[in-house]
């Protein structure tokens, strides 16, 4: 069974659904560890910095995005580790997962249609193609 699970989140509804699956899988074994990774996208974080009043306000806004996700773990009494990184989410998640030898990566999917995915690409698709372990994509 999976002992070392990486849950990639962005604070969206899709991340909340993937959180439920991470908790369910984590409960299947007593040795399971779930680590949440939240990657601050450079292009979005520049905008956040410009529109926030202070560093404290910016940090508060980022933590607010993760509040529901962390709340799910706390409600279930399931311990977790939270890691925040800066960069392009796809490659950052892949590097972190591969460098830290996770058994499973769980990521939510926005449900892009085939044209959107071809033009834009998706983080879940990038992760699934490049990470060295199994990937669970939650719709």
Segments (PLM) and residue ranges:
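Short loop/turn motifs at secondary-structure junctions
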Residues: 1, 30-33, 78-79, 101
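Structural beta-alpha unit
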Residues: 74-105
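Class I S-adenosyl-L-methionine
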Residues: 23, 63, 67-74
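Small/aliphatic-rich secondary-structure junction motif
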Residues: 3-49
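General small-molecule cofactor/ligand-binding pocket signal
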Residues: 35-37, 81-85, 136
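Phosphate- and divalent-cation-binding pockets in alpha/beta enzyme and binding domains
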Residues: 17, 92, 114
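A short acidic, glycine-rich active-site loop
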Residues: 53-64
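Gly/Ser-rich helix-loop-strand patches that form or flank binding pockets
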Residues: 4, 96-139
């Amino acid at each position: 069974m999976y002992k070392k699970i990486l849950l990639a989140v962005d604070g969206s509804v899709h991340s909340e659904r993937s959180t439920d699956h991470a908790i369910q899988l984590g409960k299947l074994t007593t040795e399971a560890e779930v680590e949440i990774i939240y990657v601050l996208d450079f292009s979005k974080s520049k905008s956040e910095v410009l529109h926030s009043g202070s560093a404290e306000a910016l940090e508060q806004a980022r933590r607010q995005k993760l509040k529901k996700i962390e709340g799910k773990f706390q409600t279930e009494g399931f311990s977790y580790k939270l890691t925040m990184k800066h960069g392009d989410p796809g490659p950052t998640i892949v590097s972190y997962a591969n460098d830290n030898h996770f058994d499973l990566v769980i990521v939510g999917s926005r449900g892009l249609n085939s044209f959107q995915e071809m033009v834009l690409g998706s983080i879940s698709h990038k992760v699934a193609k490049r990470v060295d372990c199994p990937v669970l994509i939650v719709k």
